[in-house]
Design a protein with these regions (language model features):
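Carbohydrate-binding surfaces of carbohydrate-active enzymes
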Residues: 1-298
Length: 298
């Protein structure tokens, strides 16, 4: 412990004031609403395994593994700062949120939402007129019914190219009202009904995930969405390192952290830049040992 604290002090001394006043820009915002969290946790259904935080974690994990910068944003945030907003399980839609999301998408933003969204208002009263309530026009769909699967049950869903995947937990029975289907259920009594949809709204797009897809299908869908939103990873190379960035008007600083127990090669794109913690130039095939950190100045 003493050695670690000593090392930290040395590193902070090396950094000086170089990173003071830097910002951490992100093109992606994940909407996390505490009222929504509490309302969903205390609802009596439709599935015991539906947890708001689990859904937030699943979406965040996708971006984290791709080294895509993300902000966790409240419902009253400035949505215009982002290219892509993810709002999973937006069960409670407060007054003003619908309008803010519509304005965001109209101007070219991409929105991702899905099952159990647009169910109640801020007083926890159910919206009348069908689901997803106030988000119905924005998503271009009407959800007639929600089928809750038992923990051991699975459904099958087919992409338009014929690729099939399994889904679990909840299955929205979706009617298209302007949106197009990206994938349809291929089993159960609602085979042929849309499971995942895409709707053009103004200059932007809304994606609605009406069921919980298996990991490979979820990654495939999110990859397509990220590409459409023109959101890019901080590094072009695939790496297990955590990479974050902080910027000033003049400089860009990359923070590389190896959270694994294996030695990992630093991506080639950083070769020739300066390691602020050592003052040395980053070499090609440079190794970052387990739990080591590099702060690189571009």
């Amino acid at each position: 412990m003493f050695r670690e604290v000593t090392q930290l002090g040395t590193e902070l001394e090396e950094l000086g004031d170089q990173i003071l006043g830097t910002a951490n820009p992100a093109d992606v915002g994940i909407l996390f609403d505490w009222d929504n969290y509490w309302a969903l946790e205390f609802t009596s259904g439709p599935h015991k395994d539906l947890k708001y935080v689990d859904q937030i974690h699943r979406h965040y994990k996708f971006f984290y593994e791709k080294n895509i910068a993300v902000d966790m944003i409240p419902r009253d945030a400035d949505f215009s700062k982002y290219k892509l907003i993810v709002a999973p399980v937006l069960y409670m839609v407060h007054q003003g949120v619908k309008e803010a999301l519509e304005a965001f998408v109209k101007k070219g933003g991409v929105l991702v939402t899905g099952f159990m969204s647009g169910i109640v208002g801020e007083s926890d009263n159910v919206y009348l007129g069908g689901y997803p309530g106030p988000l119905r026009d924005l998503a271009g769909i009407w959800v007639e019914e929600i089928d809750a699967l038992a923990p051991e049950q699975k459904n099958s869903v087919k992409f338009k190219d014929g690729t099939e995947f399994t889904s679990t937990m909840l299955c929205d029975l979706i009617h298209l009202e302007g949106a197009e289907s990206m994938a349809d259920y291929s089993s159960n009594f609602y085979a042929g009904i849309p499971a995942v949809t895409k709707n053009s709204y103004g200059k932007g797009t809304v994606y609605y995930l009406g069921t919980q897809p298996e990991d490979c299908a979820f990654t495939r869908m999110m990859d397509c969405i990220v590409k459409e939103a023109a959101v890019k990873s901080l590094v072009d190379e695939r790496t297990s390192l955590e990479v974050t960035v902080r910027k000033t008007k003049e400089n860009t600083f990359y923070f590389l952290i190896n959270f694994s127990k294996e030695e990992t090669v630093v991506p080639q794109c950083f070769a020739g830049m300066q390691n602020l913690l050592t003052g040395e130039t980053v070499s090609r095939q440079e190794i970052l040992k387990p739990f080591e950190v590099e702060i690189i100045k571009k």
